């Protein structure tokens, strides 16, 4: 049983990344199931912290991207909007 309010496709989710931070950081949505969404983000020089590993802020952006998109897919977006904090 799907948790999504409507039937969404992975192609639709991918189209949501245009011209925003997700695109800038290279976040790619790779899989969409009935109750989950999967994305990946490359670790680049500009997303590493001083010790060479992924910066925590970049990790938060990835989590925010997944959470916000999934939240909006669970509601009637004509009546409500879900945003992150």
Name each model-derived stretch:
Residues 1-85:
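Terminal targeting signals and extreme-terminal segments of soluble enzymes
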């Amino acid at each position: 049983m799907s948790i999504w309010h409507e039937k969404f496709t992975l192609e639709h989710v991918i189209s949501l990344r245009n011209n925003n931070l997700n695109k800038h950081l290279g976040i790619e949505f790779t899989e969409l199931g009935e109750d989950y969404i999967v994305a990946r983000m490359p670790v680049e020089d500009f997303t590493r912290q001083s010790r060479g590993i992924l910066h925590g802020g970049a990790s938060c952006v990835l989590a925010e991207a997944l959470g916000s998109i999934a939240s909006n897919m669970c509601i009637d977006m004509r009546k409500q909007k879900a945003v992150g904090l």
